[in-house]
Amino acid sequence: MSVDAETKTKIIKDNARDKNDTGSPEVQVAILTTRIKNLTEHFKDHHKDNHSRRGLLQMVNKRRSLLAYLKKKDVERYNALIQKLGLRK
């Protein structure tokens, strides 16, 4: 459900805009996407875990708002991120 430190470091390194960037929308969306994928796998075995499902919905909504912000501010960065993470078809 959570992302371990080395995976998070790799995600930050892959999506950061510069070497000290840890909070840009790109990094936040990439981390949320990884957490969402992990929780989705969790629900294949634990379909009655409604407590975690609420957290999943919160993460999806947070990612949606970050993507909307990024699209409003810089469409090119938004399109590059969507392509890189494979979120939209």
From Swiss-Prot:
Compositionally biased residues, Basic and acidic residues: 1-21
BP-aspect Gene Ontology terms: translation
GO CC terms, sorted: cytosolic small ribosomal subunit
GO molecular function, one term: rRNA binding
Gene3D superfamilies reported for this sequence: 6.10.250.3130, S15/NS1, RNA-binding
Highest taxon above the source species: Bacteria
Keywords of this entry: Ribonucleoprotein, Ribosomal protein, RNA-binding, rRNA-binding
Record bears the keyword 4Fe-4S: no
Nucleotidyltransferase keyword on record: no
Region Disordered, annotated ranges: 1-26
Disulphide-bonded residues: none
HAMAP family in UniProt: Ribosomal_uS15_B (MF_01343_B)
Subunit field text: Part of the 30S ribosomal subunit. Forms a bridge to the 50S subunit in the 70S ribosome, contacting the 23S rRNA.
Purpose: One of the primary rRNA binding proteins, it binds directly to 16S rRNA where it helps nucleate assembly of the platform of the 30S subunit by binding and bridging several RNA helices of the 16S rRNA.
Protein name (record): Small ribosomal subunit protein uS15
The organism of origin for this protein: Erythrobacter litoralis (strain HTCC2594)
Gene: rpsO
